[in-house]
Amino acid sequence: MGKSEADEDAQFLPMNRPRSSSAASQTSSDSGLSVESALIRNSTYGKTPDEAYNPAGDPRYRDIEDGEAESDQPFLPSRKGSGARARRVFWGLLLLCLAGWVLAFVLFLIQGRSGYSATSEELQQHEADSSAGVTSDGKPVTLKQVLSGDWLPRSHGIAWIAGPDGEDGLLVEAGEDGGEGFLRVKDIRARHGDDAGTLKSRVLMKKSTFYAGQRSILTRLTWPSPDLKKVLVLSDYEKNWRHSYTGLYWIFDVDSQTAEPLDPDVPEGRVQLASWSPNSDAVVFVRDNNMFLRKLSSDKVVPITKDGGKDLFYGVPDWVYEEEVLSGNSATWWSNDAKYVAFLRTNESTVPEYPVQYFLSRPSGKKPLPGLEDYPDVRQIKYPKAGAPNPVVNLQFYNVEKNEVFSVEVPDDFADDDRIIIEVLWAAESNVLVRATNRESDVLKIFLIDTESRTGKMVRLEDIVGLDGGWVEPSQSTRFIPADPAAGRPNDGYIDTVIHDGYDHLAYFTPLDNPEPIMLTTGEWEVVEAPTAVDLRRGLVYFVATKEAPTQRHVYQVQLDGSNLKPLTDTSKPGYYHVSFSDGTAYALLSYQGPSIPWQAIINTEGDDVVFEETIEENPELARMVETYAIPSKVFSNITIDGFTLQMVERRPPHFNPHKKYPVLFFLYGGPGSQTVDRKFTIDFQSYVASNLGYIVVTLDGRGTGFIGREARCIIRGNLGYYEAHDQITAAKMFAEKSYVDESRMAIWGWSYGGFMTLKTLEQDAGQTFQYGMAVAPVTDWRFYDSIYTERYMHTPQHNPSGYDNSSITDMAALEENVRFLVMHGASDDNVHLQNTLTLIDKLDLSNVQNYDVHFYPDSDHSIFFHNAHYMVYERLSNWLVNAFNGEWHRIAAPVPDNSMWQRFKRALPVFVH
């Protein structure tokens, strides 16, 4: 359940915190040097193709009388009429008025008006946003805008690339056909007129379409070779799982602007992965789970493996490794000298299958037999649930010159059924560092393998369970540091993230087999997916960290001896930055992501001070929208629960009035190591709820979440949901006591892990604080989720049966104490299986619990997108929430006949007078 910070509105979707991609295979088809990446990142993120989406006008806050035609003028009796007639007219008018009043009152009840009403006047107001520093009056944010990506900042991705002779500051740009060419390499200095010493611009591909023989090819993704003479091109793209895909691959020649199939003998063979050798003379690729080598000097493809298939994967991860370990589609790593290829061999033969049904589409690609067209398509996924057999994964090597596959037995290795390989890193020419954990991810071993002598040894052991009772998060950010005696580095080494005094910090290990590090960072703060880059010439390590506050991200540098730590970004005010360095670290793309309007700039880091070379994005259109629309204000604060300081943000409606009573919606994710409260500029569904519906929206990152230290993070281990729900309830009770909060209208919602947390909070609270909840794609029993993720935080069910019982949603009587709750799920969710929601419904049925609504989305996976589902799920969330806070679910829970108006009035009266 990989959670990426770059996902569209996707803080709702996955379950684990974001992990960086490995730098060890930058020229593979898992890298970022792709046409699609560049094109998408040079436009507005997340723009959906469904421009026809046009929700009907929202009547929720329309006063009844505002929509009615004016009544006729009152009847004026003739003076010639008698007194009796006048009396009849008088009583008739009186009865007519009374009937009109009764009708208006009935309509008032039917409309479900509550004691709180956000009027159109109020929605035009706006107060200063404490996070963005802007003030505006304007229109409310609309749901259509949020879902269409209108509020997402415009962002440019730069694909840095090293020059053929090590030149720094080169980038790959992709654009439209014509002009400067479709795919081109530019020296960053040439972008602003400084041509001194630059390569200037060279065109790699003039057009996005080209011919291979008689066939016209439309480019989808590209990967230039390291020498920039060839381009690996992907066409006919087909998505597989979250990160993986297949397609047809072509080798495009830059000089002739012509192309040939990657495998001339099998041009239509769908390839899962392709990766350039470091010296540009060969491509290793995976097809049908087997590995092949294509040397450019030959038209023939050499098979590396032959027994790959349904249960045996070579060079690519299976479902669970792709989702929970590598966060990508590659399990292949070239050595720096191109003599060897390291790759994973994954044996799934003992892993049970889970069937995912599709009722409207056929993603398997199999054409049904005649007469069987009305049966659903079924994909059988090898999916290891908690406690079930895991795939057996081994590291193997291919000697390119000898055409030989071999493996290396290493002393002290984990047993086959207890091994998870989380990172492979080439160190110098023949040495490989391998980071592996046990099945429960609480023992870490680092192995050093010499592929020349075919020997290996364990060089580091970390007993995490003995250290703090926690776990190891998989990451691929370890950085090799080659020896350079002239620069004061007599031996090879590497930089890794380690636990130091309860926080994640950078450590430098040298030589490679030395288990005692030089600490580069220390303190009560944490590094984030570090290091970002290393300047080997000057001995500088660049990284992003939370040094100023858990909700912020700033860029820092430190010497390899741990001295002279200083920021590169302005730490005098809150900020959230991302940085991407050029290959030689002399240049970087600095992305300011909030709290004010995001911007991007190219910076030069060669000198003692950062120099801004060029601003490439300032988001002027977004700035204009902020001035036009009523943006909710954000109030950031800390809350201390059981001695732990936790981060919280309150989104207040425009023109917030502390003398009014507001409903409150809690939004949470809450997964281990995740973060939802941050200082990024964000206009999302929560912003819509505050701006348009006029509710307060609160988010608390409780215990278990990231960047607040290991003690607060690891306390949840073995008992997911307990402390997290306790923290949400405690915060909600605090809000219920505020003078401007309507404690009778409090709701909570979340997606994925947040869906689980919604149900767990409602279960633990039993209607004492929250009255409503909305859970999307929730886990309801951790025995149903995948083994690698679940056992990292819960141990195995065999080891911790009581913990699994406690973490499951089992107390139906407690759920019945809530006024009402909503559960929604994609019917074809390959991640959090529909089994979770169906099992919960069965428990509710057995307990005769009926105070819930449920909705399923056919053929939708975990993100719920199929056939307009993404719009529908948020529309349903919005409408359901309005009905909840307008008291509609109270009326549904206690219906009366229409002629019992007095009883209905008495029952509804408390809602209106509150």
Swiss-Prot record:
Q: Which reaction does it catalyse?
A: Release of an N-terminal dipeptide, Xaa-Yaa-|-Zaa-, from a polypeptide, preferentially when Yaa is Pro, provided Zaa is neither Pro nor hydroxyproline
Q: Which residues lie on this side of the membrane: Vacuolar?
A: 111-914
Sugar-bearing residue positions:
N347, N638, N806
Role: Type IV dipeptidyl-peptidase which removes N-terminal dipeptides sequentially from polypeptides having unsubstituted N-termini provided that the penultimate residue is proline.
InterPro entries attached here? Answer: AB_hydrolase_fold (IPR029058), Pept_S9_AS (IPR002471), Peptidase_S9_cat (IPR001375), Peptidase_S9B_N (IPR002469), Serine_Prot_S9B/DPPIV (IPR050278)
GO CC aspect terms: fungal-type vacuole membrane; plasma membrane
Task: Name the residues annotated as catalytic in the UniProt entry.
Answer: S752, D829, H862
Record's protein name:
Probable dipeptidyl-aminopeptidase B
User: Which residues face the membrane's Cytoplasmic side?
Assistant: 1-89
Organism listed in the record: Aspergillus terreus (strain NIH 2624 / FGSC A1156)
| Encoding gene (name) | dapB
What is the topology of this protein in the membrane according to its UniProt annotation? Answer: Single-pass type II membrane protein
Q: What is its main location?
A: membrane
In the record, biological process GO terms are:
proteolysis
Q: Does the keyword Nucleotide-binding apply?
A: no
Question: Where's it found, cell-wise?
Answer: Vacuole membrane
Q: What is its EC number?
A: 3.4.14.5
Task: State where composition is biased (Low complexity).
Answer: 20-34
Question: What UniProt keywords apply to this chain's record, in alphabetical order?
Answer: Aminopeptidase, Glycoprotein, Hydrolase, Membrane, Protease, Serine protease, Signal-anchor, Transmembrane, Transmembrane helix, Vacuole
**Entry keyword Transmembrane helix:** yes
Chain segments annotated as transmembrane: 90-110
Give GO terms: molecular function aspect only.
Answer: aminopeptidase activity; dipeptidyl-peptidase activity; serine-type endopeptidase activity
Entry similarity comment: Belongs to the peptidase S9B family.
Q: Where is the composition biased (Acidic residues)?
A: 1-10
